[in-house]
Amino acid sequence: MIFHRLFLLILLVGVCCNVQAQKSLPKNMVNVKGGTFVPLYGSDSIPVKVKTFLMDVYPVTNAEYLAFVNKYPKWRKSAVKKLFADENYLKKWDGDLSLGPNAAKIQNSPVVNVSWFSAKAYCECQGKRLATVEEWEYAALASETKANAANDAKFYQRSIEWYSKPNPAYLPPVKESFRNYYGLHGMIGLVWEWTQNFNSAMVVGESRADVTMDRQLFCGSGSDGAKDVKNYVAFMRYAFRSSLKANYTVANLGFRCAKSI
């Protein structure tokens, strides 16, 4: 009887700890359990290990970013230095603190035309950071029902279809976007997203001296590898990131935040 009661007590403590852990999860963030994945070219690549981390459920919206620039004037359209954001910064906004006549249509949509510098500043002011390329790609492998949908051709076909479409006049609200296994919305089919180390996107081996991947991607053998749907989709993202500079602002490039645990 004593042992039975002790077992129940231990079980109850475990449940309470689990509930407490769930309660302490930051609002609108989810836990992405760590693991390994193979970027780009399947067996030709070195597996990358990703630690468990937290990630925002949604990309940052125009309304959220408006609150940020209201609090931090240095990131307003008229005040930001060109070193930190080019001339297209917040291009669709009507002014420093106005989303314009279409505010109702875009307030809950992803903020775009933001630079890496401004995205990084936003996340840091929330006590967070941008996700690394490795974390973002790992989380983006998830379909609606699988943490790793690397072998699901239909899942990757959806990505290709999105990449082939022109930008819509108005991006949809973030809550109406595709929701994956982790509960993350819009990882595919909404906007491109800034990552912490975007400028190292083309180097995926364990050593930064490993430059063979660059040749694979952009030379003859790269085109052969891209015939695999999932490789082509990842290639599109890596190629896009490699074209960016930290002060660039692009019409379909937004961001979300992450956090180490």
Q: What is the predicted role of each segment?
A:
Residues 2-3, 17-134, 141, 242-261:
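Extended beta-strand/loop cores of jelly-roll/beta-sandwich
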Residues 6-14:
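Sec-dependent N-terminal signal peptides
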Residues 16-17, 205:
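Hydrophobic alpha-helical membrane context
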Residues 32, 97-238, 246-249:
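Functional-site microenvironments in short loops/helix caps that host divalent-cation chemistry
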